[in-house]
């Protein structure tokens, strides 16, 4: 029989009681859970970093004005929100149609009031392709015949939170009417009693595409728009009014 068999040498024996071992394991498990919880907010903070900014627009298309009066008895507008590929419409309608309006009861060059509300929100990662409002102006005669009166477009404002004293300030956009390219087209337009129309009015929003168009201005549209922007500074965009 060797001396080591059946004999517990000093230093080889375990002095920790079983209930103390259980407490130590519980403490280690708590430390691991705490470290895991502390690492989760850091990952969430990384994901919460702003990846886009938002632009909210509230306002209205107020009225249309023609210096010598409109050619038709009634006028109505059709508008469309147009933006670049980096912009996404989060809320609000992309298209809209106003009611029929007239100024025949007043002076011929008085504003034709629409007060068409506009409320949209966009989000984007880049200011390229800043949103615009493209408006097509139509006229309707007493017999129900509709003809084109022109086009208008305007960029949504970057800054629009006005002070109370400036709330009556309005933005204006000229109403543009296409001209016939030659005499034959002019005669055809006169015989058919129809003004020339653009196949795709969005070409007016691109300076390169509308360079060769012949347009004339007749009248203007009045807008009242205010804007609220969020998250632009986090992406490094600093605009100053």
From Swiss-Prot:
Subcellular localization is given as:
Cytoplasm, Cytoskeleton, Cilium basal body
- Effect of inactivating the gene: Viable and fertile. Results in lack of localization of the tectonic-like module proteins, namely MKS1 and B9d2, to the transition zone resulting in minor defects in sensory cilia.
- Record-linked InterPro entries: C2_B9-type_dom
Region called Disordered, residue ranges: 1-42
Any Gene Ontology CC annotation: ciliary transition zone
Q: What is its main location?
A: cytoplasm
The cross-references to PROSITE patterns, in alphabetical order and at most eight, read: C2_B9 (PS51381)
The C2 B9-type domain sits at 53-197
The tissues in which it is expressed are: Expressed in type I sensory neurons (at protein level). Expressed in spermatids and spermatocytes (at protein level).
**Keywords for this protein:** Cell projection, Cilium biogenesis/degradation, Cytoplasm, Cytoskeleton
Task: Answer yes or no on keyword Cytoplasm.
Answer: yes
Query: What Gene Ontology biological process does one annotation of this record name?
Result: cilium assembly
Give the compositionally biased regions (Basic residues): 20-34
One Pfam family this chain carries? B9-C2
Q: Which PANTHER family match?
A: B9 DOMAIN-CONTAINING, B9 DOMAIN-CONTAINING PROTEIN 1
* Quaternary structure, from the entry: Probable component of the tectonic-like complex (also named MKS complex), composed of B9d1, B9d2, Cc2d2a, Mks1 and tctn.
Q: What does this protein do?
A: Probable component of the tectonic-like complex (also named MKS complex), a complex localized at the transition zone of primary cilia. Required for ciliary structure and function.
Identify its protein family.
Belongs to the B9D family.
**What is the name attached to this protein's record?**
B9 domain-containing protein 1
